[in-house]
Amino acid sequence: ICEACLHGDYTKAIRHRCDKGSKAGTRLRVIAMKLYKAIKVFDDVDHFICTCEFSKNKLIEGGIPAKKISCVPTFIDADEITPCYENDKYFLFLGRMAHQKGTIYAIEAMKYLKDTDFVLKITGQVSDSEEDQAIWKYVQENKLEDKVVFTGFKHGKELEKLISRATCIVCPAIWYENMPNTVIEAYAYGKPVVASRIGSLAEIVEDNITGLLFEMKNSKDLAEKLWRFVTEEGLSRRLGMEAREICEQKYSKDTHMRKVIKILRS
């Protein structure tokens, strides 16, 4: 994980072509950031609102005064979602199969669970991109076709049903997340989350309370956490019920609005 520009030296970004691999595009961004810094544009901001303590701490490291930052998590209207504490035998990966999302580590974990009845479902399909083809090649070479299911793009009632019947949601990210909607959405459905111990995920997913945390990029450790759902009867229900309760307490619309209004009035 690169934090080379965190303390204001943006020139390293040019060397790494951080803007979509474009040196010219990155150079323009660096010029803009240096200009913002020179004219002290952030000094004119009255207050910054972050969605998690992790992001707040990164802003502080980057030079923003702590007194100008508050943490207000995003919200979900859990009243519109009926939790389901029953489940079918599958783990669910939600979202795009981008490198930073760590999809490959969820797939690798299934090598250790070949002898179980559980499968990994991925809400996406294998595209013609080099990255997706490499993932599919890995699935084939390791004979995981019956353990890894690509469901294709899902939305609406189909997606709701897919989440509702999952044993848990898997978030194997290898890059910092801000406040993943996937996590609080899973909580609203009464589903525990198994996530990398990194960034805000390690903050939002409370280990052994609302889900389980594993070492980032460690597919064996992830498999061990998933194995617990195979062998520990009631684990998904117990963690899922805690997740739903915390969702209603910490990530509700009312809680969010109260915090925002308090900041605006201060």
Q: For each predicted feature, which ranges?
A:
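Acidic donor-binding loop of glycosyltransferase active sites
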Residues: 164-178, 191
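Short hydrophobic beta-strand element within catalytic cores of glycosyltransferases
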Residues: 192-195, 205
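A conserved mid-protein helix/loop that constitutes part of the nucleotide-sugar donor-binding site
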Residues: 89, 98-112, 133, 212, ...
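Glycosyltransferase donor-sugar binding loop
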Residues: 94, 119-136, 152-153
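Short alpha-helical donor nucleotide-sugar binding micro-motif in glycosyltransferases
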Residues: 153-154, 161-166
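Carbohydrate-associated surface elements
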Residues: 54, 75
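A short, well-ordered alpha-helix in the C-terminal region of glycosyltransferases
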Residues: 221, 228, 235-250, 256-262
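Conserved acidic donor-binding segment of nucleotide-sugar-dependent glycosyltransferases
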Residues: 207-208, 212-219, 228-234
